[in-house]
Amino acid sequence: MEAIKNKMQAMKLEKDNAIDRAEIAEQKSRDANLRAEKSEEEVRGLQKKIQQIENELDQVQESLTQANTKLEEKEKSLQTAEGDVAALNRRIQLIEEDLERSEGRLKIATSKLEEASQSADESERMRKMLEHRSITDEERMEGLESQLKEARMMAEDADRKYDEVARKLAMVEADLERAEERAETGESKIVELEEELRVVGNNLKSLEVSEEKAQQREEAYEQQIRIMTTKLKEAEARAEFAERSVQKLQKEVDRLEDELVHEKEKYKSISDELDQTFAELTGY
């Protein structure tokens, strides 16, 4: 009987212990459920935050793509502008070379005109001296004929010089198509000068040219000098225009360089913002 009681007490004690363990297990189960629910809530929060970060990352990447596209467009525009600048520089160089050749022609023509004027003046002075001498004196007539021969030689030498200049001008004409009309005008004037020199030779030969005709030739020379002076002024005006074009082109180059610097700074700012955003995302 005593053994049964002891066994009953042991069973009761075991029952109580089992109940306690069951309550503890239930409490642990409730605690585990609470922790699981809290963990699930945290997971949902993290997933939501990750989704939000991914959306922001997509927006940032899209902005970066747009910025890169704009930058590429700006670089293409800049390359096009640089090509235009190079073309303008080549064009200005050609204009300057054309102007230099024109100025060379003008100097040659001016020098030729001066030589013609000097020869004509010398011939005119000789003609006046011959007119005032008495042609009845045989010895003086021989002297006049000798001077006339010298004048003819001077005129022929001038003709040879003018022929040489004309050949040089003809060679230059092949490289100066834009100034062809001016060259033709210059050659026409050279022919006129040669014709006037031949007239001077005839005057020296015949001694019958009057003072009025000499005055007309002098006026013609002065008119040709005025024409040459006008051409020189035109050449100087073209040089000034070319210089203004170069200055304008330099301003355009400076503006494009400033725009390029601005775009580079803008691109650097965007890159810095992206780096900062990536750093913040990495920190999460």
UniProtKB/Swiss-Prot annotation:
Region feature (Disordered): 22-43
Alphabetic keyword roster: Allergen, Coiled coil, Repeat
Coiled-coil parts of chain: 1-284
Pfam families membership: Tropomyosin
UniProt keyword Coiled coil present: yes
SUPFAM superfamilies: Tropomyosin
Source species, domain of life: Eukaryota
Entry text on domains: The molecule is in a coiled coil structure that is formed by 2 polypeptide chains. The sequence exhibits a prominent seven-residues periodicity.
Known function: Tropomyosin, in association with the troponin complex, plays a central role in the calcium dependent regulation of muscle contraction.
Entry's family note: Belongs to the tropomyosin family.
Subunit structure comment from the entry: Homodimer.
Record-given protein name: Tropomyosin
Organism: Lepidoglyphus destructor (Storage mite)
